[in-house]
Regions:
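Contiguous transmembrane helix-bundle modules in multi-pass membrane proteins
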Residues: 1-124, 219-246
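Accessory, solvent-exposed terminal regions and/or long lumenal/extracellular loops of proteins
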Residues: 22-30, 94-245
């Protein structure tokens, strides 16, 4: 990512030199402020390095590359199409990297802190949100795939206000089951809810408890936006032209 940032500002050699010389400073900032990203940034990945420290090492160069890449795209707008769309592909890559750091690197998918046990008709608080399990939904007929479906209807509240009703569940096949994910889309990212499929039998027998995994994924929109920008720009480059040099 540092190399990509340097390439983005290659027309300003002095800035490239300062950028490469600042690499030790980025490492120091990551070591001192790795915990400041929040979420699961304090979780240790190995060798005494936590998720936040690794995230900052990638995030700072990506943020530095963002304005430079936008500037290159603007300079080529309305000129030769291939360089313009090529810079848009690079812009999409930068956005994807930033979103990946925020929604994946600093989020630990395997920790028990994301497991929430809900009691029917009672609100349970988790990380500023409240979840209320209201009913179990079952379906065996009319399914496009699978032999049966079991879902839990859950109201999601923020600051005491209902923001959405979701239904994470389990899709059953003859030999195995598959969790069906539901999510709440917000301006900062997605709140993803996954039901633990091992409790399907107890819910079918009338249990008032449901166990879900909850992941608050900030910046996930940047992942999808960056991916879409890269795909559309690539298609635009491949489109036939009357003049192959355009």
């Amino acid at each position: 990512m540092l190399s990509f940032t340097a390439w983005s500002i290659r027309d300003r050699p002095q800035r490239v030199f300062y950028l490469m010389a600042s690499t030790p400073l980025i490492l120091v900032v990551a070591w001192l402020f790795g915990d400041s990203l929040g979420y699961d940034s304090t979780d240790i990945l190995g060798a005494s390095l936590n998720r936040g420290q690794i995230g900052i090492v990638v995030l700072i160069p990506a943020l530095l590359a963002l304005p430079a890449t936008i500037s290159l795209a603007k300079e080529n707008f309305g000129k030769r199409e291939i360089p313009f769309f090529a810079h848009l592909i690079h812009l999409g890559l930068v956005l994807l990297v930033i979103g990946h750091v925020m929604s994946t690197t600093i989020i630990d998918r395997g920790t028990f802190s994301h497991t929430v046990t809900l009691i029917k008709d009672e609100r349970v608080e988790w990380e500023g949100y409240e979840f209320e399990f209201t009913e179990v939904v079952t379906q065996t007929d009319g399914l496009e795939v699978g032999d049966g479906y079991l879902g839990a209807v859950i109201n999601v509240y923020e600051d005491g206000e209902l923001i959405e009703t979701v239904e994470p569940g389990v899709l059953r096949f003859d030999t195995r089951s598959r969790s069906e994910v539901d999510r709440v889309s917000m301006w900062h990212g997605d709140l993803v809810l996954i039901m633990d499929g091992t409790q399907a039998r107890s819910l079918m027998e009338g249990s008032d408890l449901v166990r879900i995994m909850v992941y608050d994924l900030p910046g996930i929109h940047l992942v999808w936006g960056g991916w879409a920008l890269m795909l559309l720009s690539s298609l635009a480059i491949w489109m036939p032209r009357s003049d192959p040099t355009d």
